[in-house]
Amino acid sequence: KDTNLEPKIKTSYLLIGLNKIFPKLEGDYVTFIGSTFVTYGKEETYLNHCICLGDTENIEKESQVIECYENEKDVLLAWTRLIQKEDPDIIIGYNIFGFDYPFMYDRAKENQCVTEFMKFSRTKTEKKSDLDNTNIILASGEYELKYPPMEGRLQIDVFTYMRKEFILPSYKLDYVSSYLILDKVKSF
């Protein structure tokens, strides 16, 4: 008799029992997705766009758009439509490979809309429903990076770049921003 299986079996029965009593555990929601679009060579953005879960006040500026949706699935799919519509060549973010993409992907799985959500590629026939991943090894350790396949678009994670190219006491966004602009970043 294999005694190593006993704790696993007991845990399985416990989980089955708890699932009958308690509702299924849900994760955190995607409450908003903010995107800024700029044309290469221009200093001004042409669109500041925010997709929100639930209602919020609108901003009366032509280049700023707020879209509100009643459920998280619609929030996620609205961002996919935005990427398809604006058709960016380059997508830049901070820790998007370590947090944003994996988080949104997990939420799309929870909302059963992964196939629709993952339509970011410029190749209309490309249908992938998993994140691509790769590992990088830095002095501080090995890191797994996860990102959606977006054929025809360059994706840059500034967080990964900063950890690789700069030795800083902190890689929090406010510290890195202050370091790069040589001034203290003010929070509002």
Feature names for model-found ranges:
Residues 1-188:
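Metal-dependent nucleotidyl/phosphoryl-transfer cores and adjacent nucleic-acid-binding surfaces
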